[in-house]
A protein has these predicted regions:
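Short acidic-glycine-tyrosine-enriched beta hairpin
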Residues: 37-53
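Ligand-binding loop in jelly-roll beta-barrel domains
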Residues: 44, 53-80
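Short secondary-structure boundary/capping segments
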Residues: 16-17, 24, 40-41, 61
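Short acidic, gly/pro-rich beta-turn/loop elements at beta-sheet edges
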Residues: 15, 35, 69, 79-82
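Short, conserved beta-strand element in jelly-roll/cupin
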Residues: 6, 17-34, 72
Length: 82
């Protein structure tokens, strides 16, 4: 499932997420400190991250707004609709 995420000064604080599957993030605009488990990645336009979504993850610090990134989630086969 693809999602286009945009964060601005009016965005709510992002919680930490955790869900089944794998996730791929591709930064389009801005800068963010993105947490995955105990690691924090400083990400800017052009950067990408692929990770196990079972591990807690999410934006930790919004460094340069607006922030825009593509998030593509691949859920386990049992969750996919036929």
């Amino acid at each position: 499932e693809p999602y286009l995420i945009t964060l601005t000064t009016e965005s709510d604080v992002f919680p930490i997420f955790q869900h089944d599957g794998s996730e791929f993030i591709y930064m389009l605009e801005g800068r963010v400190a993105y947490r995955h488990g105990r690691n924090v990645y400083d990400m800017k336009a052009g950067d990408s991250l692929f990770f196990d979504a079972d591990v807690p993850h999410g934006p930790e610090k919004l460094k340069q707004l607006p922030i825009s990134f593509l998030s593509v989630i691949s859920y386990p086969t049992s969750r996919r609709k036929g």
